[in-house]
Amino acid sequence: MDDQGCPRCKTTKYRNPSLKLMVNVCGHTLCESCVELLFVRGSGSCQECDTPLRKSNFKVQLFEDPTIDKEVEIRKKILKIYNKREEDFPSLREYNDFLEEIEEIVLNLTNNVDLDNTRRKIDMYQKENKDTIQRNKIKMTREQEELEEALEMEKHENEQRRLHLQKEEQFQQMMKRKNKQELLDQLETSHLPASILLAQHKGKSVQAEMQVEKPRSFKTDTFSTGIKKGHHIASVPVTKIEEALYQYQPIHIETYGPQVPHIEMLGRQGYLNHVRAAAPQDLAGGYVSSLACHRALQDAFSGLFWQTH
């Protein structure tokens, strides 16, 4: 980060830690002072690529690579146009193709690849899907409002819970001070032994703690995302494609050698007589001696029947 700097005035973050770099739609950076100086009229051209820019479009650089800031801004603009959802497509494959098209457009605009055709494609899509874009935009706005309302409600409930716990804690502290003062008064005035008074005080304290009202649990009907508990989101089901059930077919590998005995038959046929037994720590990991023996036999038998023609 220390080598980041303004390409015009050559000021770096190493020499000026409070340097604020700004980035525009072209992806090239300028410091805040240079932006104020060059765009005093509200508009101007980029010092590196001569792209016409507006002063109001400059934003603080968030990432070390300004290209990422450029990609983020481009993606925001594209997603406002390409705002279809999965339920707008008859199949999952078409929805995935739609997402892939978005990524291709963002990639082209970010890296300045085939800009004319890409912008032409965006304009054509915007004209053909004007109604769908507007409908989804209204739907997103409504959902955003519902989410903000749910978050505000959750925040209010958390505040009420905090105040309730605070009052409960203050009440308990007040009762402790009161009981302590009563004990001191009894020790001064009573003729009973101190041990009996302390035992009585301890019993009263336990009863008082048991009688203290437990904090009420604030049950909510919705999650923080706005989804009601116990409810399901209504969505268009994905079209089910009827296909034949999968049938397992054993894999046959031609080894050009004798058939290797099954792993369960190795001990009966004497193959494990001279194989080191597995240690307890090996067994814990699932290893048994027959596995290594079976693999060694596969390597030994492989290619014994091979004949060159």
UniProtKB/Swiss-Prot annotation:
UniProt-listed Pfam families: MAT1, zf-C3HC4_5
GO MF annotation: an example: cyclin-dependent protein serine/threonine kinase activator activity
Zinc fingers (RING-type), renumbered ranges: 6-50
Keywords for this protein: Cell cycle, Cell division, Metal-binding, Nucleus, Zinc, Zinc-finger
PROSITE patterns recorded: UIM, ZF_RING_1, ZF_RING_2
Quaternary structure and partners: Associates with CDK7 and cyclin H.
Function of the molecule: Stabilizes the cyclin H-CDK7 complex to form a functional CDK-activating kinase (CAK) enzymatic complex.
Name of the protein described by the UniProt record: CDK-activating kinase assembly factor MAT1
